[in-house]
């Protein structure tokens, strides 16, 4: 069983930073960043089929793992959690093996080292936010390609008090909002919410805070009107803070998550990428089919192998998985893991509007056609 300290959570706002306009300019920094990653990263034993091995760019994706078997190194930006339910089930139930791909998984401290690993060739793919991917492409010329959309909804929410609820972006005017960090995806999402109602960023003060149920005391004391959390945390808050109410950002903001690969990785290892995605899609379909039972089979299998905190609470686990399933299938069951040009462009255009991303960039060049 993979045990995870419940306090071991990395801020999802530790996002893409620095300048890497080309793979050549980037690669020196990447080597050091991923060396640190490999020394302290978490290898999710059993999530893939291959044991932990050391290696350079050639190990990221290849056909050298055995006759007819492809290999893929994937970097996650968060420690083990329910957000990776499809990837875990793909390993547990043999979807990777069925599709002829041997998977090695590492964990990085946020998107920056994960993307660096992809660009250096040390990893084949990573999963990160659509908004942050587009900002990296537009502002820093990151030569990355979105090869699949996973979730298709903005993954955040603003929690507030039922006695003074924040239910729509216009309610934010003049209200102090807590954010996990400055300049990250959470703050950018807040700016997108504000813009959607015609307000200015100056209309909504913000301060850096935590994002746990304990942070709600700042709302009770009147120091905050609300603060940003992960939308998958809403059930946890409902149980711990009965006075809490929520404004999910997906009602107002175009965002989601995608798998990204480098241009070289996509060109040289398209078959490995497609095989990996086919395995994850099969696992997604199985989890979706388990909805009628309240995801009982899925949760049982995960508990047999993993020990992260959200699995210990039945209602929280069900709510988290259901949020993911709803997000995977927003565009229909037939669109699982398919890229969507309209959604990609809409997210970029919204980011340009609030000056979160440089305008005039042809981001469609960085979107792969559907691979599964």
Q: Where are each of the predicted segments found?
A:
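N-terminal secretory signal peptides
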Residues: 1-25, 34-45
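Bacterial signal peptide processing site
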Residues: 48-50
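Short, glycine-/small- and polar/acidic-enriched structural segments
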Residues: 54-210, 221, 225-231, 243-251
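Stable alpha-helical elements in mature extracytoplasmic
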Residues: 83, 92, 111-114, 132, ...
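Pocket-lining segment of extracytoplasmic ligand-binding domains
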Residues: 214-307
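Secondary-structure end/capping motifs
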Residues: 269-354
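Hinge/cleft segment of the Venus flytrap/periplasmic-binding protein
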Residues: 346-372
